[in-house]
């Protein structure tokens, strides 16, 4: 393509080309012609990640200085709305300029904000982040959240992804309950709280992995996909009655993935675990829309088998249940137990995976 043709491309074509480039490549298009010189400065989506940098020969101090200069340069020359801002790098720790950048973004109706600090201590999010009322997607890695007392929630937020984060129990509960449009929630390797009370009327997807004591749902009737990974079996307080209470509040669940530590009752609770028949008779309970189930790390103890039996006998739409034991010990007996359970769905398939 000749230079004149490049210069005369329609605006929407130029925008499409720029949207496919990294911010580094987009800035370089300024040399193509005068019409392209600052065209990149109108990009609504700004992504600063490893693809934008080439700092392999620099020491950490020089890398940080270069990072700050790049982001400052782009934000200074940028002209127009900023809908998405992503900052992800292994050397972001100790860069106080992040506060200043977030303050700048809070004045530009930011809709999608992603901050991933791969090393170092938790980065305390500045109070100005909590004034970003146009946020639709928020993703934080290795951060500390302490909202100001004036924070009333993110009224437009639909997706929240928190990994390696620290926040207090009341902060978590207030955050979730004050995001009325929240549809997707991901929590991984968090600390500061161990009890999760999820109040989210529009929540459809929930993925959790970490160390916690209990999960309960309140007004979360739209939830369809649930994935639970408990990383420390000593923290599990689950028994059949708790699990029943858990699923009674999820009438529209369609897909479930669960790590078996969540199913293991403490020894003193084993005797209190009710039978599936009693639970069904007492509660008239059914998972009418459950289609896919995956249970990992089971060992064949009574709470696990009760739970599997309950799902199989009360899920008329179930298509597939995948079960993976924690070890080879007792695998054949476990398989025989699984095949003995009655299934409410004639099409339900049980898939046994080797450990």
Regions found by a protein language model. Name each.
Residues 215-265:
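Extended repeat-based solenoid scaffolds, especially LRR ectodomains
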